[in-house]
Design a protein with these regions (language model features):
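C-terminal and inter-domain tail/linker signature
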Residues: 3-152
């Protein structure tokens, strides 16, 4: 257990608060992403997870999320760094900010051709959490910045 003196009171971070568990859940999700552990990511999702794609459609369900991960794996190799997670006190919502370091190795439909271009791009995500599972993931990044970096 960690205890810190903050603003005149001691703050305890021991993993027992819902806020702590939400933060840990999101960090575990991103750790699995960075390892390429798609099964590990899927295990953290609710069966009816809602996934809002950046500037795209809303997809629902773990199977749709698995299909998304397979498509991403075919076109991109990415690592998220400098991850910061904030969670609501009740643990029902969380937000993350990160920097994507990636390589575009397989052309993705509607985007410029892939030739192994690299990119560094800030991004963020919002989460809803129900019953210690991720029920919604909404991702944001600047698509125009990414296109400029890969030469589109």
């Amino acid at each position: 257990m960690q205890a810190r003196w903050v603003g005149g009171f001691t703050m305890k971070i021991d993993g027992n608060r819902k806020q702590d568990r939400a933060t840990e859940l999101v960090l575990t999700y991103y750790s699995a992403f960075n390892r390429g552990d798609w099964d590990g990511m899927l295990a953290l999702l609710a069966d009816d997870v809602v996934h809002d794609l950046n500037q795209g459609a809303r997809e629902t369900g773990r199977e749709a999320f698995a299909t998304f991960l397979a498509r991403m794996h075919a076109s991109y190799r990415e690592q998220l760094r400098d991850i910061v997670v904030l969670a609501s006190l009740d643990g029902d919502r969380a937000a993350a900010e990160y920097v994507v370091h990636g390589e575009y190795h397989g052309s993705d439909e509607g985007l410029p051709p892939a030739t192994g271009q690299t990119y560094v791009l800030p991004g963020g995500a919002f989460f809803e959490i129900h019953d210690d599972r991720i029920a919604r993931v909404t991702n944001y990044y600047n698509l125009q910045d990414w296109i400029a970096q890969v030469g589109g």
